[in-house]
Amino acid sequence: MKANRLLLSLAISSAISSVAMGQEQDKWSPLETVTIIGSQEQARRLAGSAHFIGANKLQQFSYSDIQRIAREVPGVSIQIEDGYGLRPNIGIRGVATERSGRITLLEDNVLIAPAPYSAPSAYYFPTVGRLSAIEVVKGPSAITQGPFTIGGALNMVSTPIPTEMAGNIVTEIGQDSTYRVHATYGGRTDSGFGFLLETHQWQSDGFQNIDRSNQGTGLDVEDYTVKLSYAPLNSNHEIELKLQYANQDSDQSYLGLTDNDFDNSAFRRYRLSELDNIQTEHEQQILRYGYAFSSSLTLSATAYNNEHQRSWFKTEGIDFDGSSNAQDFDRTSWFNVVQAINTDSTLNGFTPSQLQAILDGASDTPAGSIQLRSNDREYYSRGVQLGLNWDGVIGNTTHNVEFGIRIHQDEEDRLQLNSNYSQIDGALALDDLGILGNAGNRVQKADAIAIHIHNDIQVGRWTISPGLRYEDIEQKRTRYRDGEARSFRDSRENSTQVFLPGLGVLYQVNDELSLIAGAHKGFTAPSNSPGVDEETAINYELGFRYQSGALSTELIGFLSDYDNILGECTASSGSDCVIGDAFNGDAATVAGAELLISADLASSSDVNIPVSLSYTYINGEFDTDIADTDFFGSVSAGDPLPYLPDHQFLASVGFEKNNFAAYLTGNYVDEVCVRASCNAFEQTDNTFTVDLAANYQFSAALNLYARIENLTSEEDILGRQPYGARPNKDRTVTAGVRFNF
């Protein structure tokens, strides 16, 4: 199977190459019509915090994991889970990291989470290895992007249609039977037609090992993109169609390890997770139209449709007495089992050694005692967004006005199944398949209208950027009985209307130094839970930017003053709550500072020694006491917000001479509390990870590269949710070739 996939990928690449060899091999430059910022130079001009990571920067390490890319942006927090970034946990400026559900995720400036309003957890994430740029906007800069505006937005830019006929093939192999192929070909004709063909294939057996099993713990990802465009010469019109399809088959689990087992073998997995597997399928259609009324006034219109299906079959818990049918299962979470062993406590009359024997597979369990759930969900996210941009001069002020409106609808449809198994001789045996819908039978839906207006006003050395966003959201959840027959059970609704003002200011002291300040009201929708308020915070930032030659420095302090911090129950949170419910967390405060320094230390004209430092300090805590809740637990004022490291930094140094380049990075992240109580075994380890990459440019067309991730083979607990200690990825060596034509 794997060999056939590799041959298929190489065949696709070869076919693209053979067609392209007859075409001109001129260099092309990417279009930037789907970006928020467009370049790092443009980011420095904004009256708010923003960062741009372009293609050249991405190629230094050629990562396929968004978490290893995004960590270089100050203010970004990451909770490692599977080691590959398949379903990443990313937060910005202290918002919750879980499933990246508190930041606005976009691909090509279009909402990309499976259901951004009704179910924002990112169980789909774009294949990072095919992207051409990454953008992060924070503070007042994020007011044009919603619905999550407290932390900010992450926009992923896909491969643009080349301006001339050109192609690219990247092939790499690595440890754990890993391979990756990325191939593109396309261009534009003199008549105005353009096209792009693209495929990305990625496979690995995984870096973890399941007890007494040959089952892999890796992934198998296929991704295909087609773009067609028409922009006639001497015309003010342009149209582009994007079609994208991706599927994934990965053997990922929520079941972690006890601390003692982690210390003995960090990359072990209990055989109880042998059947755990997630399969996903994603389809996207985007139609864009642009019209230039004049050189200063342009209109854009985008219609989009995203459809996503996922089926995650994984172990959920244990009923120590066993259940004759799957509907009567009395579940104890694996988290409680792991914690009982960690704390040397009994659980349901079982001693720690008896519990350990169950995890080890050394003890048989009663019939129907192990629960596995088929977490089947279908999503759609669709809508239309219009934009109007005007650049002009009024008196002695210049204006860049952006007006946008988005009409959006999304839905999550759950029809899930609990099945009962028993553990016999260290392996799982099915006892009762269960009745479809016994683990969730509901549809939640959202209709939203979002409007924003933003104006960059330049007066002398000043740039003043006021903005206003309006969100009108209607949400509904309907629950059903009787499986696929779906007889009505109950429903609930919630509606939200909110105005979100913001203001950013930049003062250009001189050609090298600028000062920035800003404030805006941030917002997160409250889901469909009645009586739950929206998450709101007043956000402030203040800092400066300095650039002189190759030296660039940015220091920004930020403060988020929450009126109400929101908690949303998901399976990955590990909390004892109903999945999909939201909870008020009352007041909280997040304060911090972001530092970014880059320079070139070389004194020779033919050598570059680029160095950079990205540092983030964050302090987040609850401001009020909260009685015991299913999500937050018991909270006292001053308790820390979970998964927020106080200190983190990424330092890098490179060496570039003629056709050779090498880069070394070191990433440090403080330990974090995984729950507000921060009791024993509720903290991660601090960690320092080193990556090394090198490449050699043999010609304009051929580049060879190699990469070592986790050079020193660190083994640290980077997560404990939902069911035990989780590791970072082991040391991994990869080699690849990049061919341009």
Located regions from the model:
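Transmembrane beta-barrel wall of Gram-negative outer-membrane proteins
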Residues: 166, 173-203, 212-253, 277-294, ...
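N-terminal periplasmic "start-of-domain" segments of outer-membrane beta-barrel proteins
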Residues: 30-61, 86-89, 103
